[in-house]
Amino acid sequence: MQLTVWTYEGPPHVGAMRVATGMEGLHYVLHAPQGDTYADLLFTMIERRDRRPPVTYTTFAARDLGGDTAELFKTAVQNAYERFRPQAMIVGASCTGSLIQDDPGGLAKGMGLPVPVIAIDLPAYQRKENWGAAETFYQLVRALAGPSAPPPGSKRPERAPGVRPKCNILGPTALGFRHRDDVIEITALLGKLGIDVNVTAPMGATPADLTRLGEADFNVVLYPEIASQAASWLHRIFHQPFTKTIPIGVSATREFIEEVAALAGVDAAPVLKANSSRLTWFSHSVDSTYLTGKRVFIFGDATHVVAAARIASDEIGFKVVGIGTYSREFGREIREAAKLYDVEPLITDDYLEVEAHIAELQVELVLGTQMERHISKRLGVPCAVISAPVHIQDYPARYAPQMGFEGANVIFDTWVHPLMMGLEEHLLAMFKDDFEFKDGAVPSHLGVGHSAPAVQTASSEPQPSAIETPSAAATETAAVWAADAEKELRKIPFFVRGKARRNTERFANENGVATITVETLYDAKAHFSR
């Protein structure tokens, strides 16, 4: 067990709640103590939903442990059914509730309720949130779509001539990163291809909708962390193929369109020709030193990290210096992606390890989760959020997908805005010491009679004799920078300053220099210019 102030994923029953909350007509009865009801806040405060999640807690207390907690659970199930009248119910235990081993599934099924009751048995101390969501969705699909499965060995009937192809969209849940807008974007894209959407699940689907999953010709998997297990089962039982390409970025969206068109037997050319993304042109039209070669570190769930690395490297021109994920179930995908960029993958759920890695790499942009936003703020590095878990500001009121051509536009704006433009940095460097433009200067339109606001400037504070860089903090033997050397370094143009810093530190370490001075800086320049 590890004590921490942050976790990338909650326990698996939170994943089950994400599925239940995203659906309609489904109710989740959770055998849990009073303290486990915090999960309501995730949906009402963080995602800002206008209703509570469809979850009933038994909320047993310490005094109940000496009595019949099984009867307490059965009462909660009966009351939940009578109050909400759902089409189906799922039952399970929280991580704490599983310790008393009351068997919620067996208890609920023995009650004879007139609706399907699906037991969700989640190993709370071995698995986490995304796995719990995937397992819950799989059990729902298997229980509700299974009865309409064709006989084993039978072939899937051909689609009648003139009938539009149909697909299911699988994977979006509550509390997902831009899932709501991604579904809208991909549904519109499929419509342009002449493909109808049979069911979108879990988000927006009812238990009755899940019984119709087998009617589709194929499945579109948007989030493999949630839907890959269910899609594999549908492929095996209903002979429905499913997509492998995640349409995040211009190139991936084009490949997705071609893949979907091949599965549906439609012509992709008109939609490919009508590419509405501005990312490609914008990334070529801005100042090349503003984007090209920026050192970027990417961390999050595997789906978004792999897609982001491709966009960063191939479509924007960043240099990917590190990628990682907190999801060990998808470690293989991250390791394969890391080989493409010749970097060492970071697979961990320890945010302190992630922070140390970011500091060591001396990156210029971080793409990650809410925690990487906090880390970047501490390190003074620009950051953009690309993956759950996220905070309130990443559930915007506006339309902001990540998928499709419009998603590529959103991604470009989101990633580029935190960066300082080349002209902006040059102007700040040129005028930061000017007597008219410093912080304490009187605004020119106020005249000489007004006093300047009292501002504590950095120059008025005593300066340390040496400034320690992130790399120096990372290792005890690394050289430190003298103040005059730091000042001289800032005279170097920003787009090569990072390289100059790294080369100088490397030169100092190789030659046993403890403190980097101005002379060391120029000696290193001469050394690497040979």
Swiss-Prot record:
Pfam families: Oxidored_nitro (PF00148), PCP_red (PF08369). GO terms for molecular function: 4 iron, 4 sulfur cluster binding; ATP binding; metal ion binding; oxidoreductase activity, acting on iron-sulfur proteins as donors; oxidoreductase activity, acting on the CH-CH group of donors, iron-sulfur protein as acceptor. Its EC number is 1.3.7.7. [4Fe-4S] cluster binds at residue 36. Coiled coil: none annotated. The active site is at residue 287. Keywords: 4Fe-4S, ATP-binding, Bacteriochlorophyll biosynthesis, Chlorophyll biosynthesis, Iron, Iron-sulfur, Metal-binding, Nucleotide-binding, Oxidoreductase, Photosynthesis. Belongs to the ChlB/BchB/BchZ family. This is Light-independent protochlorophyllide reductase subunit B. It comes from Rhodopseudomonas palustris (strain BisB18).
